[in-house]
């Protein structure tokens, strides 16, 4: 059946999920609900099940034990293309075509106006970068976007996803090549853009999750910790350890210039 009109709650209740031809569960007891306007953060070590959760929401596989529901209807009962048209997904390695920057952003909505294209580019903090290119939005990006940095490519694909105006935005480690300050700006913009929309962010860098209404920490295919950023940084566990480590790493990577200046003084 077609997906009902209007914004609805996304409810994930996975009792167990095994990939085809495997017996070891990739996920066990993963449950969460997301109302329109909420932002969910997903984190955890590599291989913990983050990508599996995201692929089940996109219905790349069907679940036999449990279900994912939208508007309280299991995804298996919804038309697949109708469901996927409600999602905008940005992966870690975005795909750009050998075309202009503007056409790359308008990929999912070729009829979009220049004004709409620039609006989403601003939300994705990439508008200023584009204006610095030789022909601005009409600059050809070359094969697979070779002219652009990794962070610029990620931001262009975030702009492309925002232009789709989908109800559910999924960022799968899609800010990994973006610097901390820009990441902060994009997340702030997403909060405002996302009023009434559902945003799911999976990330290795935990600073990307501080705005989330709930964060789930995946380990070995299940939810090891959950809560808001402020409460998780105060609980002993993977999240607090990793957050402290990343804060330290960020502070150290900002420091070397000072030492060089002192050495040259």
Residue ranges and their predicted role:
Residues 3-265:
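ABC-type nucleotide-binding domain
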